[in-house]
């Protein structure tokens, strides 16, 4: 995107933070205004994460102005808020390509820029990595500083507190900035708070406060106020400062995160402080664009839109997403069973649980960004006779793997996992692709795993998992619109026979064993090859009798899945064939052994040879 020098006279001159640091402070507020407008214009034309970045404009400018990046380490947690950072670090002209195939990564990425110290995408990793970098920097003795920026949602995760507990123990020189955008924690910002912040951020106060009131009163003026601050330091601004102080941090704040000069002043004071520092800033998600300020959840991630209209485009598609199918089913069964408990780790809207949360608030739990807790919480409910359903993205279930094994599967508890975003998710790239779940779940004893091929099967499999009371079960479905199927059949729900596949097309010589929503593409290929097509439905347990029959009556078997080939559903078929000494060649088609970058779902599937044309070519090449 071309940066018009007339519209952006200051931003247009800045290609690196070094150039930013050459500006006088008088220009910083104007730069922030230009950067905010540039972000609005670029995201409206390209789509992407929006509201978070609007809220971190001033912080981004202040950090790159005060700290000597990239020599100093600057880490963004998750990365939703890092678009302004990308714009200021040499990627302004490519920002329009973000989240597109061969474009900028959706989150900070080490392969993309030396300013991206840590590749991110999942939450709450910044402080752990930052502490490692801070300790390494201390051993270098070059004066390098480390800063971690984390949001009020991400800081609720256990990993963040584990890292802060360690950082407080090591006393390393590390600055954590809490970007509190009023979506979770909130504190008032006022004149007294600002005055306290100035005192707390001064080096002399940081050095001397350990000796408490006597030294503070002797050294600093306004004795009465300082005595009060000294007495109340551990309770300053309520529980926030008390908690972080007890973890070993020097708590500073809260600070107005939209006053760039105030941030520069405070960061300069903090930069050379010794030990772990905690700066609490208050920002407004969507700041500077009124529609995003009023509804930051809606404007968190956006399609292309017209900024002047103040509204997002309305889709008129009659199609329904798999997430919505799950939400509809959840409401359908909850109407008859008050022991159903729906659980999500901070993904209510994305998982299709908004209506359920409104209709059945006593049966709904958003546990925040706490995947491990979500799973073990579900285990406790199951032990007590309730029917927990954990709605979770495939990529985030990875974070709770031990809990799935230790707390659910070993105890054989009836917990249903509704695993959303299985397979290719598209624009969010390699950190969010659901490439591994069939592999990492299939090896767990006691686990039932189902892969629906359409909306109807999705509902019936969810119901089957809900009614299965002998252990844990998984229904795994992709992002995006569902293949409709015959949804009229699901007005009266019924269970599917366990481990039974369905032959969708009878053919000769070649049998295609499909797992999941690539069935339509598989059907096109099967018709062209006159092959038998089977909707296997169950990854575990497999329909072993059907596999034996197919092996007996065909010359080759093809397995097809939107999961990594290594350890996936096809591997399960291979294992069964070898164990039973069935003499038939098998081709496994699925995701390759590398991390898959961003792009649209259709672009990626085509590139990987998982559309109809690609599947056909793979089979023909292998046979001949």
From Swiss-Prot:
InterPro entries per UniProt: Dxylulose-5-P_synthase, THDP-binding, Transketo_C/PFOR_II, Transketolase-like_Pyr-bd, Transketolase_BS, Transketolase_C, Transketolase_CS
Subunit structure of this chain's protein: Homodimer.
PANTHER family in the cross-refs: 1-D-DEOXYXYLULOSE 5-PHOSPHATE SYNTHASE-RELATED, 1-DEOXY-D-XYLULOSE-5-PHOSPHATE SYNTHASE, CHLOROPLASTIC
Protein name: 1-deoxy-D-xylulose-5-phosphate synthase
Reaction catalyzed: D-glyceraldehyde 3-phosphate + pyruvate + H(+) = 1-deoxy-D-xylulose 5-phosphate + CO2
Residues the entry annotates as binding thiamine diphosphate: 80, 121-123, 153-154, 181, 289, 371
Binding locations of Mg(2+): 152, 181
Cofactor(s) annotated in UniProt: Mg(2+); thiamine diphosphate
Record pathway: Metabolic intermediate biosynthesis; 1-deoxy-D-xylulose 5-phosphate biosynthesis; 1-deoxy-D-xylulose 5-phosphate from D-glyceraldehyde 3-phosphate and pyruvate: step 1/1
CDD domains: TPP_DXS, TPP_PYR_DXS_TK_like
EC number assigned by the record: 2.2.1.7
Family, per entry: Belongs to the transketolase family. DXPS subfamily.
GO molecular function, one term: magnesium ion binding
Organism name: Blochmanniella pennsylvanica (strain BPEN)
Cofactor note: Binds 1 Mg(2+) ion per subunit. Binds 1 thiamine pyrophosphate per subunit.
Leading EC class: transferase
Classification lineage: Bacteria, Pseudomonadati, Pseudomonadota, Gammaproteobacteria, Enterobacterales
Pfam family, one: Transket_pyr
Keywords, comma-separated and alphabetical: Isoprene biosynthesis, Magnesium, Metal-binding, Thiamine biosynthesis, Thiamine pyrophosphate, Transferase
SMART domains xref list: Transket_pyr (SM00861)
Function: Catalyzes the acyloin condensation reaction between C atoms 2 and 3 of pyruvate and glyceraldehyde 3-phosphate to yield 1-deoxy-D-xylulose-5-phosphate (DXP).
GO cellular component terms attached to this protein's record: cytosol
GO BP term, pick one: isopentenyl diphosphate biosynthetic process, methylerythritol 4-phosphate pathway
């Amino acid at each position: 995107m071309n940066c018009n020098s007339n519209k952006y006279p200051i931003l247009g001159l800045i290609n690196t933070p070094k150039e930013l640091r050459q500006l006088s402070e008088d220009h910083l507020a104007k730069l922030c205004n230009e950067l905010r407008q540039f972000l609005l214009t670029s995201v409206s034309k390209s789509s992407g994460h929006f509201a978070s970045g609007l809220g971190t404009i001033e912080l981004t400018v202040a950090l790159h102005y005060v700290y000597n990046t990239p020599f100093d380490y600057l880490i963004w947690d998750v990365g939703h808020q890092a678009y302004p950072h990308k714009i200021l670090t040499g990627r302004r002209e490519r920002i329009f390509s973000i989240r597109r195939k061969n474009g900028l990564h959706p989150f900070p990425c080490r392969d993309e820029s030396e300013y991206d110290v840590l590749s991110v995408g999942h939450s709450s990793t910044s402080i752990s990595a930052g502490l490692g970098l801070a300790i390494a920097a201390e051993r270098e003795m070059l004066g390098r500083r480390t800063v971690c920026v984390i949001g009020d949602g991400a800081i609720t995760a256990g990993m963040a507190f584990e890292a802060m507990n360690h950082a407080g123990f090591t006393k390393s020189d590390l600055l954590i900035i809490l970007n509190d955008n009023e979506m979770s924690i909130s504190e008032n910002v006022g004149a007294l708070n600002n005055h306290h912040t100035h005192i707390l951020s001064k080096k002399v106060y940081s050095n001397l406060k350990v000796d408490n009131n006597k030294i503070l009163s002797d050294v600093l003026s306004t004795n009465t106020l300082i005595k009060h601050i000294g007495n109340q330091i551990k309770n300053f601004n309520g529980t926030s400062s008390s908690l972080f102080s007890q973890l070993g941090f020097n708590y500073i704040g809260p600070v107005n995160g939209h006053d760039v000069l105030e941030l520069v002043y405070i960061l300069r004071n903090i930069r050379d402080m010794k030990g772990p520092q905690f700066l609490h800033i208050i920002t407004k998600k969507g700041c500077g664009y009124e529609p995003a300020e009023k509804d930051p959840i809606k404007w968190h991630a956006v399609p292309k839109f017209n900024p002047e209209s103040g509204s997002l485009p309305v889709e008129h598609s009659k199609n329904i997403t798999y997430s919505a199918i799950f939400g509809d089913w959840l409401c359908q069964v909850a109407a008859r069973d008050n022991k159903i408990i729906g659980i999500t780790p901070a993904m209510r809207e994305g998982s299709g649980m908004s209506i359920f949360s409104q209709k059945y608030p006593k049966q709904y739990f958003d546990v925040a960004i706490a995947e491990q807790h979500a799973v073990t919480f579900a285990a406790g409910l199951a032990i007590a006779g309730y029917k927990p359903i954990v709605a979770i993205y495939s990529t985030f279930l990875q974070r709770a793997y031990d809990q799935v094994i230790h707390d659910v599967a070993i105890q054989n508890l009836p917990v249903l996992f509704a695993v959303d975003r299985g397979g290719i998710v598209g624009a969010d790239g390699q950190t969010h692709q659901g490439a591994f779940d069939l592999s990492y779940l299939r090896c767990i004893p006691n686990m039932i795993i189902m892969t629906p091929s359409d909306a109807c099967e999705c509902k019936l499999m969810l119901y089957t998992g809900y009614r299965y009371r002998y252990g844990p079960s998984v229904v795994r479905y992709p992002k995006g619109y569902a293949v409709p199927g015959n949804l009229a059949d699901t007005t009266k729900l019924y269970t599917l026979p366990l481990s039974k596949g369905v032959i969708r097309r009878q053919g000769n010589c070649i049998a295609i064993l499909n797992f999941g929503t690539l069935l339509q593409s598989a059907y096109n290929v099967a018709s062209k090859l006159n092959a038998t097509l089977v909707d296997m439905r169950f990854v575990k347990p497999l329909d072993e009798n059907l596999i034996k029959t197919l092996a007996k009556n065909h010359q080759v078997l093809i397995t097809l899945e939107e999961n990594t080939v290594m350890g996936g559903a096809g591997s399960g078929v291979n294992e069964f064939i070898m164990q039973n000494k069935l003499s038939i060649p098998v081709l496994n088609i699925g995701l390759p052994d590398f991390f898959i970058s961003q792009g649209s779902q259709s672009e990626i599937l085509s590139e990987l040879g998982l559309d109809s044309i690609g599947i056909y070519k793979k089979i023909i090449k292998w046979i001949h």
